[in-house]
Regions:
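Active-site metal-binding loops of divalent metal-dependent hydrolases
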Residues: 9-12, 40-44, 100-102, 152-154, ...
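Conserved beta-sheet core of the metallophosphoesterase superfamily
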Residues: 146-197
């Protein structure tokens, strides 16, 4: 049985490419996928990032919370656009693969366990949206048929070769913000790694 899927990496809401997201939404409505896979880094999550706070004074929690809430609101607004298109075509199978930017949320909650609402699954309403959640780069990846999906782990010059070499099976990933492919043929058949950007 052939099923159609749309896979999107690294949207980084709210600093996303607005035209690209409109095209993704239109593609969903034209293709009518059976499966949608979000490969993570859906949000930029600026105020959760240690990069943002490096060299800056820590803000008191009452000043920080509004910034965090704005990040959550902005990223959910972006996901809402995609979900609206998925709802129009009745796409029921939805997967969310956590990216390294979403890991920042979970690390924040480890530091402040009383702010559980900022965990990735909670902040993005993963269950309510109908997504199956896949934590960041676990050994057991999302696998559909013979194809594995992960956010991405390696960023070297030949990252698609590295992903294929390490995982040893066909794999699709994002993380690198560029396109790359590597294919290997052996006695067991052909396997490939695709970086979607």
């Amino acid at each position: 049985v052939v099923r159609r899927a749309i896979v999107t990496p690294d949207k980084h809401f709210p600093i996303h490419d607005k035209k690209a997201i409109k095209i993704v939404c239109k593609a969903i409505e034209i293709v009518k996928p059976d499966i949608y896979i979000d490969l993570g880094d859906t949000g930029e999550w600026e105020h959760f990032s240690s990069h943002y706070w490096k060299g800056r004074s820590a803000k008191p929690m009452e000043d920080l919370i509004p910034l965090l809430n704005k990040d959550v609101k902005d990223v959910n607004k972006g996901m809402d656009m995609i979900d609206e298109s998925l709802d129009k075509v009745n796409c029921k199978e939805r997967h969310f693969v956590q990216g390294n930017h979403e890991v920042w949320l979970d690390k924040f909650v480890i530091r402040y366990p009383y702010l559980e609402q900022y965990k990735t699954e909670n902040a993005l309403k993963i269950e309510k949206r109908g997504y199956e959640y896949h934590p960041y780069n676990r050994k057991k990846l999302l696998k559909i048929g013979k194809l594995n999906f992960t956010h991405g782990k390696f960023v070297s010059k030949y990252h698609s070769f590295k992903h294929l070499d390490v995982y040893g099976e066909s794999i699709m990933y994002g993380h690198t913000h560029d396109l790359q492919r590597h294919t290997k043929t052996h006695a067991g058949g052909t396997i490939s790694a695709w970086s979607l950007g």
